[in-house]
Regions:
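Active-site neighborhoods and metal-handling regions in enzymes and metal-associated proteins
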Residues: 1-132
């Protein structure tokens, strides 16, 4: 498997998770679904500390955490949330590295940036997650 094929595993995984992610899903469930999807698409392992999917939401999306210290938070997605997913599939020692940020607004994944309600997101960034 070449680099582009491994990257495609990660891209397909993000495309998949965007169809199933919803409010009240636990970040740990999202990690599990992402890792299972990558394995089903041909990844044989995960190159970064054996973690296939780093999942962050809300204020956690602004921090940097070493894989050595990473623990997926036991946290639920809210109706208005921001989620960062960073994937690290590997196949036959070929690494992929693919990250995306997903916006949930009014319980729905926003697929195009122009569909984000600017006032709501501005409120998010100025007042914090709880008032979004």
């Amino acid at each position: 498997m070449n680099y582009l094929e491994v990257q495609n595993i990660a891209k397909q995984t993000i495309d998949y998770i965007k169809t199933v992610i919803k409010p009240n899903m636990n970040l740990r469930e999202i990690r599990y679904l992402c890792e299972e999807k990558m394995l089903s698409l041909g990844a044989d392992s995960f190159w970064y500390w054996n973690i296939g999917a780093f999942i962050f939401s809300g204020d956690e999306t602004t921090i940097s955490v070493s894989g050595r210290e990473y623990v997926t938070a036991d946290k639920l997605i809210s109706d208005n949330d921001i989620i960062t997913i960073d994937l690290s599939p590997q196949c036959k020692n070929v690494w992929g590295d693919y990250a995306r940020t997903i916006i949930i607004e009014n319980g729905t994944v926003v697929n195009h940036i122009e569909n984000i309600k600017k006032q709501r997101m501005a409120k998010w960034f100025t007042n914090g997650r709880s008032s979004a």
